[in-house]
Amino acid sequence: MDAKTQAKYEARAKIIKSMAHPTRLFIVDELARTGERCVWELTEMVGVDMSTVSRHLAMLKNVGIIEDEKRGSQVYYSLRCRCATDFFECVESVMKCNAKDQQKLLAS
């Protein structure tokens, strides 16, 4: 693999890795559903402390999945690329395929 191809796959892996936590998946799903949320809203919804939610948001922002906008004393987060929800559809398809395979094994 040449350096350009390697860099492309490393960038992809970094983005996918940023989604590899249930809380971050929830945040992305919630932002896709509602359009935007501020930190305290997400903190209440997730049920963990604000610093933990802030770390999750920072990771998602760092790879370009979400963006923020400061309004007064609040910071609102939204999806930067709505195509992030396509990732969920792909994951759901894989889960369905896996479930079908598991059912076939159990039926054997």
Where are these regions (language model features)?
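Amphipathic alpha-helical dimerization/coiled-coil segments
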Residues: M1-A11, R33, R82-S108
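N-terminal helix-turn-helix DNA-binding core of bacterial DNA-binding proteins
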Residues: D2, A7-S51, R71-R82
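Short, Lys/Arg-enriched C-terminal cap helix and immediately downstream tail that follows
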Residues: V39, G64-I66, G72-S73, F88-C90
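Alpha-helical residues within the helix-turn-helix
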Residues: E44, K61-N62
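Short, hydrophobic-biased segments on the C-terminal half of alpha helices
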Residues: L57-A58
